[in-house]
Structure formats: structure tokens, C-alpha cells
Amino acid sequence: MRIAFLSRHFDPQGGGAERYSVAVAEELAQRHEVHVFAQTFGSSPPNGWTPHKIPGPLRRPRWVNQLWFALTTAWLTHRGFDVVYSHEHSWHGNVQCFHVLPIRYSLLKNRHGWRKALRILKILTSPRLLAYWWLEGARLKGVANGQRAVLAVSEPLRMTLEQTYPVAKGKVHVITPGVSSAVPKSAQDQVSARAALGLPLQARLALLVANDPLRKGLKTLIHALGLLPPEWKLVIAGHIPAASAYCALAEDAGVLERLLFIGPQQDLRWAYHAADVLTHPTLEDTYGMVVLEAMANGLPVVVSDLPYCGISAELSHGSQALVLQDPTDAPELAQALQTLVDQPERMQQLATLGHAWAGQKTWSQCARAHEAVFEQVTANRR
């Protein structure tokens, strides 16, 4: 098949959506002709796929750039491709992948009566919100008759999509992320990784991977850190805008010197190998790829429960992970982390069971599931 990928930022150092699209494209490129249309690409050279850079004359406001990207890619890919696979808000693309909660759901949830009326008025008077509202609805056009397929990266996201858009009920395919490899770290791996990243060799290191740390639970982690012994440090990996704001929060809590920023990582395995535990007290994640990746590297995980994190729909508390009922509860988080120190056998059990579970979810399987959907869509067009 000749496949076009639409993704504004095609970079494995981006968030989960970006890493998902890159991994699937690289897997599919082994068997198909894959073309990627994006405004920015990562530093790594193309791995079997052909890049097409889309100019961005107006990167701000973002909604105008979104319309520009949709219009440009629609013109470039309207013919010559069996599948146009969009990870963006666009009316074009016979396969649409949703990575985040629907805008319509987020704007109107828990709003009734006059509060709902006021929100609708706000939408109607905002070009930005109207653009996103329309673009999102356009992604579902044709799904009822099989001319278009819709994918969700988790079962909870599928349920929310079908609740928000009844036309998609029973039509959304769930294809969860995978991992490239599942090799547990060794003690020597941890020593080497800490040395390479300039991290202390003897400390207890909790890891947070995030480009939006506050939404991923940094505030709770900072307060939890203050409840833990001084040996605990928090390693933060990712693009951290306005780091001073987070430092001020940590300084107020008396833990500033225990925050270790290592920035974005080309290969997160170094960070996973260096840490003792992954902490993911996220406030909103439709899946949580970093949780799966950490497990694949043999790292025990503390993660938010539903409805905060989609991957928790597949996990059992105390088996593959420690699951937090309330991601804003710092004492609960601190207790979970200290439990791993006080009960090393439980820590090892979590790492072992989590690793075994993650090893069953590969990018190869994910790509095969995509192929099945692509074949179904192309067959419906004949």
C-alpha cells in the first residue's frame, strides 16, 4: 500500500502521540511505501519512509496553523495514496487516529443549564474554538458507511469518543501503543545510565517523563517528595518550559535541591535504566505510553487510576503496578514510593510482572492491527 501519514510534529522526542506515529510509520515502512507529511521532523534520518516538509508561514495562532496544515496536506494527498492516515484535526484522511479527549467533550463535560448555554456562547464567539470544533467533527465524516476508519489509543478514549459522537458508536477501533523491545535493566545498566546522565549513584531516584509536568502530576510529586526521606530525588525528563516556576514551587516545599532536570532524551532507555521507579501521577492521559515503556525496561511503576490514565484500565493494582486512586493525594503517593523501599521483594515482583505484561505489547503487533484497518477501509472504497 501507498500510505500518507499526517502529523505536524514527527519527532520521537515529542509526546506520546508523536512517538506513536513515528513507531507505527517505521514498522509499516518495512512492508509498504510510507510518506510522512509534517512541519517538523526529529533529528534522526528517515527510517524507510519519505519525508515531506510542510511550511508553516503562520505558526501562531496555533488554530490558524492547524487549518493551514489541514488545507495543505489535503491538497498534497488528495490522490495517489491508498490510505491517508491523519493524527491531526483535518477533514482529509480516510483513517483518523485520536490521541486525546475530544474537544467537544472537554468543552461541555459537567456543564448543564445556564452553564452549558454560556459555554456554547463562548464557542460561537471564538474563531479558535469554532475552528477546532469544526475540524474535529469533520474527522468523523464518512465513518458511518465505512468510508473512513477511526482509531483510539485506549479503550477509555474509545468510550468517550462514542459517547461524544453517537455516529461513531461501534465504529471506533482501539489500537494501543507498543514497545520496541522488552529487556529488563541490570544493576550495571543502572550504574552506567546514572554516570552517563550525571545522576547520583547512591540516591533513590523517582522518574517523571513529561513535556507538561504540572498536568503529569509534578505538583503532587513535589509535595510527596517533602514527605519522603532525603535520599529520594526526582528526575524530570522532557521539554520543560519556564523551569523557574517549577523551581519556585519546589523551593517553597523545601525540596528544590532534590529536583534533577535532565531535559529531553533522544533515547529514554537511559532515563528508565537510571531510575528506581517511574512515577506517573497524571491528571489526564488517554493512555500513558511512558508507563508501558518503563515496564518494558523492568522499572516498577506508580500510576494514576482511571479516569486519569487510560493504561490503568489494563492494569491490576499490586500486580503490574501500584495504582493511585487520587493523583493529587501527596501522602498516598509518598506511601506508595516508600512501600517499594520497605518491601524490596514487592518492588521486584512489580518489576517482573510489569515487564512480562509489557513484553506482550509490541509495535509490530500494533502495525499489524493498523494494516487490518487499512485493508478494510480500502476494500470499502472499491
Regions found by a protein language model. Give the residues of each.
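A conserved mid-protein helix/loop that constitutes part of the nucleotide-sugar donor-binding site
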Residues: 19-23, 204-227, 241-244, 369
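Glycosyltransferase donor-sugar binding loop
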Residues: 41, 179-180, 209-211, 233-247
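Membrane-proximal helix-turn-helix segments that form the acceptor-binding/catalytic region
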Residues: 121-153, 159, 164-165
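Acidic anion/phosphate-binding donor-loop and adjacent secondary structure
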Residues: 162, 171, 178-196, 381
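A short, well-ordered alpha-helix in the C-terminal region of glycosyltransferases
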Residues: 192-195, 339, 346-360, 372
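Aromatic "clamp/platform" in nucleotide-sugar-dependent glycosyltransferases that forms part
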Residues: 264, 283
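Short hydrophobic beta-strand element within catalytic cores of glycosyltransferases
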Residues: 300-310
